[in-house]
């Protein structure tokens, strides 16, 4: 503890984030993505209705031995762990451990993470590093977007002049997944 300047103890509960229920379009998109998934893949699922819909499809499927390497761990991953889909057994980096940088979800998710040795919380500079992701065999990054043009270019931050979200790790994960074996 010699490198710590201050320690502040608190018994204030962690903030929770409600799980966004997918809409009909989210479900349709997830159904189009699902056939491309294979046993043993390492997943990064973004945030929103479509990744939640895909997580539900995976939880009810025959897929097995999936891995987790993600910026944001949410209740969608908890559902996959509870269904026995994520084992991290086939990962080529941090085998046996799901890796994440930040977490937001339910109290149940926080309880699951508490002293869970099969989960590794790492700095964002590591988790979001495309060079690190490139070391993961069968790594796939699945994110949602707000809009797409006819060329397939996506926008995941704004709609017209209305800002919806900030720049997250989506580009890092797309680059990392593209570089992965």
Regions found by a protein language model. Give the residues of each.
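Conserved phosphate- and dinucleotide-binding cores of soluble alpha/beta proteins
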Residues: 1-181
């Amino acid at each position: 503890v010699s490198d710590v300047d201050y320690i502040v103890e608190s018994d204030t509960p962690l903030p929770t984030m409600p799980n966004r229920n997918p809409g009909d379009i989210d479900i349709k998109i997830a159904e189009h993505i699902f056939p491309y998934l294979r046993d043993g893949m390492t997943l990064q699922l973004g945030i929103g209705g479509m990744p939640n819909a895909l997580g539900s499809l995976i939880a009810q499927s025959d897929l097995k031995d999936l891995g987790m390497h993600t910026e944001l761990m949410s209740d969608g991953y908890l559902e996959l762990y509870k269904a026995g889909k994520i084992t991290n057994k086939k990962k080529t980096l941090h085998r046996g451990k799901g890796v994440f940088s930040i977490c937001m979800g339910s109290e149940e998710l926080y309880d699951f993470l508490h002293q869970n040795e099969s989960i590794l919380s790492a700095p964002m500079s590591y988790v979001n590093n495309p060079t690190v992701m490139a070391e993961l065999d069968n790594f796939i990054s699945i994110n949602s977007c707000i809009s797409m043009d006819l060329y397939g270019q996506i926008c995941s931050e704004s709609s017209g002049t209305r800002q919806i979200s900030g720049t997250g790790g989506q580009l890092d994960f797309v680059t990392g997944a593209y570089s992965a074996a």
